[in-house]
Amino acid sequence: MRSIKLVFLFLILTVLKVAAQHEGQTYIPDPDPLIQKRIDNWQDIKFGLLMHWGPYSQWGIVESWSICPEDEGWCVPDTVKDYFAYKKHYENLGKTFNPVKFDPEKWARAAKDAGMKYVVFTTKHHDGFCMFDSKYTDYKITGKDCPFHTNPKADVTKAIFDAFRNQGLWVGAYFSKPDWHSSDYWWPHFPPLDRNVNYDPAKYPDRWNNFVNFTHNQVMELCTNYGKIDLFWFDGGWVQKQVAPVGEAPQASGFSVKKAFNQDIKMDELVTKIRSKQPEAIVVDRAVEGKNQNYLTPENMVPGKLLPYPWESCIIMGGGWSFSYNAKMKPSRDMIHMLADIVAKGGNLLLNIGPGPDGTWYDEAYDRLNEMGAWLKINGEAIYNSRPVAPYVDGKLRFTKGKDGSASIIYLLAENEKLPSEIQVNGLTPEKGAKITMLGKKGSSVKWKSEGTGFKIVVPDALSKAAPSKYAVVFRISRVVL
């Protein structure tokens, strides 16, 4: 029992540490007015889908990390006796990956119906397996060794991007800067020691330059062959120009980045190339402070307070980032509350689903998305095109403002809870004569009265007993004093 308490305490302290890191980070805006405008547009759409998918889904394991020789719980499994044999077995997963039930149009419809406005897909994760048709490697889903390569939708990145664009969603390319399959990153001359390049780029500059060129070439394939891409989401923050002494530095996800060498991937140059083909593209160079990190990405957590810069929480719906057998999904109530909490603090929610090895989603994922969509159809006015407004968060209340001078108060309902007859609101004042209505109920104007430092909403008994939406209710104020 004591050990369980210690583990629980460790997890709590880790979450607090990660939250503190995000709340204290420096944000450097992109100087381009066009990109600033696109970021503002992105802040309007609020809710997106992230998908981690690759051959690793066949084993139901954490994506890529099980071949990383680090002493971390998400890396090489304890059961592995021969690392190199295991790595070879892992790399052969592409030879049996055959997701014949892949239906991107079904995914796109489900995402749209859920109220999602953008998608980010893993075109390549750290293991280097390409889910797009790159001519710079044979380690790809369209390669002749992969049984799916003869399928008309073998280029799954293209199929996904086309399907989601057709439903009106933005599309984003997740791309891993490290590539553990590339002999120019993990050089077979040396054994890999951790997530980093396994040789000194300063000592072997030609090899490192080969890797930089390889990376740039693959990214430019995505820029030129896959239509308009709204977001480039670069992962692997340890691959960056070294500006501090070699050692460890905190990464946005909360663990330490073991930066063994200067790994200058020439990101400024790469972003210039991207924008020459995709002038409106938002670039997120995750966990690398600078103008190429157009917004910040707290990982699998929600910051404790308003953050004064563009940000997005990427959060797992259930299981892991990638598909896992017998995954347990988060309850719909929790996810709707989480979305409201994130938006009230100025962020976007990027909700992750890991497709299975046959190309399908969990049935429960569709159920959760249906419920989120039903809630947003009624209450989306409080979410989309909104911005945070003080007091942001107060107990069960979350606050947002519209661009028309209105404001929304989101009341988070606990399980089996009915709305109280009166709701005290502090720190926000309606204008004189302002009307308050409950979204989802026509003619549901409610009375309010000034009280203390705020006001009190009087909820009619009929509305309390029959709220128009489950999980959370929204009160819209026509005008507020700002």
Task: Give, region by region, the residue ranges found by the protein language model.
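Mature catalytic domains of secreted/periplasmic carbohydrate-active enzymes
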Residues: 21-482
